């Protein structure tokens, strides 16, 4: 259903690690047992035409002063590595070496930005990020389907290139309806608990 909705809207979509594992049948080393369960369930549910569409998604998209990847910009696959406190500096260095000011990424499912301002670098999680004084940044808009920030709302961000602002948003949705559906399809309790806890 999600794939069909994306196809209808003709959005720019990039390939993630689960997409790659689903279409190749090869999960990455870090896939947990429940992650593998989801892959097996997805393989039984997703039709061939939809798998073909996923297989043809680009691993990244680069435009103007930004790049979008699922994982980390310095990872050759663009969808397996994480941007987090132990890797953000080398990923910021990668952006500097390639003259890319902004990288939008996912994979961590944690909304926020690692930045380089002058010689200062760090992480911030604010409602709005002004880009005018930032040299390079790694922006995670969060996760619509499985946030891991301790909040259960669906997360997203809006990038206004003209105003040089990224606005971060959260929106409520019927979580219990999703949980009921997961129970119906026999999803592991661990995944249901994770969704309820926003972890």
Predicted features, each with a name:
Residues 18-19, 72-74, 107-111, 144-145, ...:
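Catalytic metal-binding/acid-base residues of hydrolase active sites
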Residues 45-115, 199:
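His/acidic metal-ligating clusters that form di-metal
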Residues 21-25, 75-79, 177-179:
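A short acidic, helix-capping loop that chelates divalent metal ions and anchors anionic groups
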Residues 1-51:
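Core catalytic region of metal-dependent phosphoesterases/phosphodiesterases
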Residues 116-199:
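Acidic, His/Gly-rich catalytic cores of divalent-metal-dependent hydrolytic chemistry
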Residues 1-3, 80-81, 115-118, 152:
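Short amphipathic alpha-helical segments
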Residues 13-17, 69, 102-107, 138-142:
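Active-site neighborhood of phospho(di)ester-bond hydrolases with catalytic His/Asp-centered motifs
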